Amino acid sequence: MRFLPLLASASALVASAFAAEQSTEERFIKFNRLARLSSPLQLNDVSYKSLTSTPRDYSVAIVLTAHDARFGCQLCRDFKPEWELIAQSWARGDKQQESRLFFGVLDFTEGRETFLSVWKTAG
């Protein structure tokens, strides 16, 4: 049973190392392709780290949320359609990506480690 957390940690480490090797422009191109398919970007711990790693020459606006009913965040569920509307409207208006701004969502179920990290630094 201890093997699974070790495997998850190793996978995250390898993904982080790969993300660090990508240049800012390569990361921009990668996330730009994804954003054209769906905006806001649906992130997880690995993609969040890649998207927000420095240096970068683009901006990110990310909502950390908890949509699952077991977390009891009604505000999260109420805000979701508004955030999606903002992200989609921005994407339609900035087709050439001149603003170099990405919108994203990181849900607790997909980004537990990121939430814990943010909570530690903020609290």
Predicted regions located by residue number:
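N-terminal leader/targeting and pre-domain segments
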Residues: R2-V60, L101, G123
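Eukaryote-specific detector of the first structured module of a protein
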Residues: P55, V60-A61, H67-D78
